[in-house]
Amino acid sequence: MPDTARRGRFRRGAATAAPRRIPDPPRRILLATVAQPFRPEVLTRAIDLATPEHAKITVLGIAKVYGTSLGLPNPGLQPNRIEWQTLKEGVDAAADALRMRGFEVRVGLSRSRNASKMIAKWAKARNFHAIVVADPERPRWRRVIEGDVAHEIGRRCVVPVFAVPIPSTSDRRARPA
């Protein structure tokens, strides 16, 4: 029996698609936040990335859904009207700041239990070349519990993730006894 007739590794079938090449200066950038306003450092990093190619920027705000009640969706765990309004104002302010710099900007709002999964879905579906997110300084135990958004996004998609470190505003010294 010839080698080609055997069932095994070398079956006929459709070829796998070649991975798409991501341009070095990105032409489409996703600027994302999870339930908080954009910090100036994050906007500066997005502007630095977008400037060489005058990239198109999409500003995405993710509202956090906090879980289920007895396995059923509970309206009290969904983002309320005030949270939506605060998130929309923050996203619009960031978009206006980028438009003042001359960039073409689109705005998106979404809600999700798993924000990193939603950001990765947006990046894949709309073919972005770079993702910029804030990486606030947190203790290690909190990173383990809450997860690291930048690492989770990078694990879910092949688009480069630029995590901008944000220093903590709290004083984390030990309290006097």
What are these regions (language model features)?
Residues 45, 83-94, 118:
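Short, solvent-exposed amphipathic alpha-helices that sit
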Residues 26, 127-129:
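Local beta-strand N-terminus motif with an aromatic residue
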Residues 130-156, 170-174:
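Glycine-rich, Arg-bearing micro-motifs that act as flexible, cationic patches
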Residues 74-79, 123-126, 149-151:
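Short, hinge-like loop/turn segments at secondary-structure boundaries
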Residues 2-20, 61-89, 171-177:
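Acidic, proline/glycine-rich short linear motifs
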